[in-house]
Each structure stands twice: as structure tokens, then as C-alpha cells.
Amino acid sequence: MTAAVRPLPIIGPTGTGKSQLALDVAERLGPLGAEIVNADAMQLYRGMDIGTAKLPVDARRGIPHHQLDVLDVTQTATVARYQRAAAADIEAILAAGAVPIIVGGSMLYIQSLLDDWSFPATDPRVRARWERRLGEVGVGELHAELARRDPAAAAAILPTDARRTVRALEVIELTGRPFAASAPRIGAPRWDTVIIGLDCDTTLLDERLARRTDAMFEQGLVAEVTGLLGRGLRDGVTAARALGYAQVIAALDAGGGDEQLRQAREQTYAGTRRYVRRQRSWFRRDHRVRWLDAGACSPPRLADAALEAWRHVS
């Protein structure tokens, strides 16, 4: 496979500048042509723009983007659905002779795409039945049911994690096996390419995250959440749990005063920092990643370094 038809994944923690690097790289590819494929789970949702730092259309420099705004907030985002859709987008871009640039920080989504995971079956009717049961008895009782059926799965899933509890019970019912036995099977790398990782010093990134959080609230995150509540956000299994959105919903439920919103802002910042630690831990385990320092290099140098690594895949 020549470099001209290799995907170029750009991964890394939240707030490191992956989207801007992707745009810079795409512009440098010039005549080859490039299209960007989103790998941020929450940017899949229509209307979730400010809180996910989704690039506005007029900031995308005319470069086609895929896997943005493909779900309503009431729909459940799943790794399996994303994998199928994003892989199809990438193959279509490659078939047209252009370069797919995969950009995001959602760990499972990225790995399932790059490493061709195979997922256990799903059945909407079985899922719906367990979700109804969740609504009737609550996540605590449902988790207790999971513990009776599969103690190992219950030990691995937080008692407050309704989505994973429902999924585990669905898989157990469909397969008749423990949940762990039906875990996604990791296949060989789907494409022969390099993975570019973008990170920077923790102190610098913390400062960026603080500014990013403040900017989201100042640019209208509360109004965005309020509008999405009118479109069913509260009923969304995954969308309502997104960082920033969950905190604002809780603040509005508590009265929506200045103090509640101040706490929501602080909780969003703290939650984002925790998420960054998880991202770093996950991505650092993958020794295929070529890491670039976003704090030590100018944007042009970062783009040059990313393209140099991509063009010289061994």
C-alpha cells in the first residue's frame, strides 16, 4: 500500500489540538485530497456542538467531514454501529484516491476501527426489554440482577453504569455465556499505517482545559443543553451522560442558579481532567503510536512531522 492511500489516524487526549492538526495536514496533502473522519463519540450527535468542541462548518476550511451530526440525542451511540459506518466512509474515501484522516479521542471507537474488532450480536427487542426493566426497578436492582447472573461482569461494571449493565444482560441472554466470554475480539490492524499521537505537558494541558471549559460556558453551553432537553436529551442513554451536558442537566435540575452553574463548570473541568488521564493510560499502551508534543512544536512543524511519519511507514 502506498502512502497515497493510507489512512492517517490522529489520536490523543482532549484539548491537545487534534482537529486543527488534521485540518493543517489535510491542506498540506493538496492535490491528493483528504477527508476527515470523526472519532469522537459525542460529536456524532446533532446539536451537541459547544460542549463537544465540534468544529463549525465555516471553520472546516472546505474539507469534507464524516461521522459528525449523524445521531439524534435520543439515539444510543454504540461502538459497533460507529465501526461499521466509519469503516465504510474510510473505504469509500480510499476508493476515490483520497486520504482519510481519522481524528478523535474516544478510545474504544478508535481501536475498534483501526484493529477490526468483532462484536457480539445485539437484539433491539431484548435490549428494549432490559431498558424497560431498568425504568421499572432502577440501575441498582438491575445491577443486582447482573450480579446474580454473572458475578464477574457485575464486579467489572460500576453499579451506577446503567448502559453497560443493560448491555451485559442483553449479551448474556443472547449468548447464554458470561459477558466476558462475548467481549469484542480484536483482529489484526485493518490498515497498514502509522498512528499519530498528540499530547503535551500536563500543566499546559490543564491550563488549556480550564480555558476550554470556561469558553464553553461563556459561548452558551447552558442554552445549548436547555434546547436539547426540549429535543429529548434527558432520554438519551449516551448523550445525556456526556461531559458538560450531564453536569449542566444536574445544575438545571437543582434550580439553575449561579452557584449551581458554577459547580457545573468546576465539575466539568474536573471530569475532563479525569478523562484525559484515562485517555493517556489507554493510548500509551499502543506502541504503534508516534507521539508529537503539541506544546513544543508550532502548528506547521506538527503537520510536517505527522506527514513525515505517515509517508515513511515501514
From Swiss-Prot:
<feature type="binding site">
    <location>
        <begin position="14"/>
        <end position="19"/>
    </location>
    <ligand>
        <name>substrate</name>
    </ligand>
</feature>
<keyword id="KW-0547">Nucleotide-binding</keyword>
<protein>
    <recommendedName>
        <fullName>tRNA dimethylallyltransferase</fullName>
        <ecNumber>2.5.1.75</ecNumber>
    </recommendedName>
</protein>
<feature type="site" description="Interaction with substrate tRNA">
    <location>
        <position position="106"/>
    </location>
</feature>
<comment type="function">
    <text>Catalyzes the transfer of a dimethylallyl group onto the adenine at position 37 in tRNAs that read codons beginning with uridine, leading to the formation of N6-(dimethylallyl)adenosine (i(6)A).</text>
</comment>
<dbReference type="InterPro" id="IPR018022">
    <property type="entry name" value="IPT"/>
</dbReference>
<dbReference type="GO" id="GO:0006400">
    <property type="term" value="P:tRNA modification"/>
</dbReference>
<keyword id="KW-0460">Magnesium</keyword>
<comment type="similarity">
    <text>Belongs to the IPP transferase family.</text>
</comment>
<keyword id="KW-0808">Transferase</keyword>
<dbReference type="InterPro" id="IPR027417">
    <property type="entry name" value="P-loop_NTPase"/>
</dbReference>
<dbReference type="InterPro" id="IPR039657">
    <property type="entry name" value="Dimethylallyltransferase"/>
</dbReference>
<dbReference type="GO" id="GO:0052381">
    <property type="term" value="F:tRNA dimethylallyltransferase activity"/>
</dbReference>
<keyword id="KW-0819">tRNA processing</keyword>
<dbReference type="GO" id="GO:0005524">
    <property type="term" value="F:ATP binding"/>
</dbReference>
<feature type="site" description="Interaction with substrate tRNA">
    <location>
        <position position="127"/>
    </location>
</feature>
<keyword id="KW-0067">ATP-binding</keyword>
<dbReference type="Pfam" id="PF01715">
    <property type="entry name" value="IPPT"/>
</dbReference>
<feature type="binding site">
    <location>
        <begin position="12"/>
        <end position="19"/>
    </location>
    <ligand>
        <name>ATP</name>
    </ligand>
</feature>
<comment type="subunit">
    <text>Monomer.</text>
</comment>
